[in-house]
Each structure stands twice: as C-alpha cells, then as structure tokens.
Amino acid sequence: MHIISLFAIYLVTLTITLNAEVWKPDKKPGLIPTSMFEVDPSLEVTVWATSPMLYNPTNMDIDHEGRFWVTEGVNYRGRNGTRPNGDRIVVLQDTDNDGKCDSSHTFVQEKGLIAPMGVAVFDNVVYLSQPPDLIAYTDVNRNLVFEPEIDKREVILTGFNAINHDHSLHSLTSGPDGKFYFNNGNCGAVFTDKSGKTFYMGGTYGGSGANWPADHLKNSGRESGDGHVWTSGFAVRMDPNGANAEIVSHGLRNSYEQILTSFGDMFQNP
C-alpha cells in the first residue's frame, strides 16, 4: 500500500500569546480525521506533521536528505504583526524513520519576512520569495541554521509586488536546462536582472492591504529592455545568478508555481 503523508494544518483564529522568539496560539487546533479523505484503495492518507512544528505554511520544498523546508505566513495580511520577530523558514525531519515528523527548528526568522510565498533548496543554498526580493541564503557551515556572522545572504533580484499579498512572488524551481524558473502573480513588478535588463510588468490589478514597492499601474504598456510589452502575472527563466532573464509566459492571474518535465515542458496553473 502506498502512503500519502500530509501536513495537517489548521488556521486557528484564537487569542494568541507571544514570546521572545516563536509565536504560539494559546490552544491546540483540533485534528481532522484522515478518514475524511477519499483516495484509491491502494493509497493511505497519514498525518506527517502538525502544529506546533509549523504554523500556517505557505510553501515547502524537500531537500536531498528528505528534510522539509517550510515557509510560514503567521503575519499574513490582517494579522501582520502577530509575530513581531517576523515569519520563518522551518526545517522538519523524521529522524527515526517511523513515518512521522519528530524534529522541527527555525532556519531563519527576520522581521522583514512577511508571509513569504516560496522556498526552494539547492544543496546548501535556500532561495526565499519575499517581495520585493528574491533572496538566497547560503548555509556555509551546513548546520541548517542561518547565522549572519558565518553564512551569506544575497538579494538575487528585487522589485516585485506586493509585500504581504498572495498575488506576488512565488516559488523558484529548476529546469533540465540548468536554468531557474519562478513566477509572480498579477501584482506586477519592475525588476532588473544581473545582466542589466529591466522588465516592466504592468497590469490593472491593485488594491489595499499590501505594500506596493513598484508602480505597475503607471508602467502598464511600457516596453521592457527585451523590446516586448508584458502584462499581468508572469513566469521568468534565468541563470542561477539572476542574469539573462527571459519572460516565458504572461497574462496570468496568479500562477503559484511551475514544474518542468525532463524535456523542458513547463506546467503551471493560470
């Protein structure tokens, strides 16, 4: 029998308590019975991890050792400020191989992390999608904890709308061509790649409840450095260092992530 392990995640709208480092609700969430899931008889649904190992996850990736790297969005939208020290990337592990998570710790927590929507792990480099930035954390000593005095933090690209909005910068993935791919919802962007080429990603979508560092409304219809006019949500292909960026799709509403086959065909929701 094949087993499907799921994160059991529950949005708890309760009065909260704060401590110096980690936000915690004052009550435990109720569990949803796995019997509620309808699957093929050859499959089984099991719970792999629950709160307090993680809270309100927004994205995840699995590294070559089977560890789960999860972004959290406790400070999402109207609850911004709930966790004063900022949101986190947490690392989850099953250390005794019994099919359940038994270890959870913080990789990085910063006040500037506000419901980041994407995480990708390549060896000891962790990429975080935190508008307006696409950030790379290099875990130099490979201890699974970001230490500013030892490790490296680099902004690969910047200029993506909107901060604390789910129509913004989403997760990065890799393709068989050695390129990196990522997408952004229809909040728009104005960003310059490491080759010096500027892209104006316009559109008509806007609203309150978020911070908009780029004026995508003003730049709607403006020609980008590649000679094209792009609009709305989009996907980008680039070198791992942020150079030679190309727009590979646009006109989307809010594509959350993309996946590429071994032949380079890309699939994404619109």
PLM region spans:
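Beta-propeller domains with acidic blade repeats across secreted/periplasmic ectodomains
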Residues: 20-270
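Hydrophobic alpha-helical segments, principally membrane-spanning helices and signal/leader peptides
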Residues: 4-6, 25-26
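Bacterial N-terminal signal peptides
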Residues: 5-15
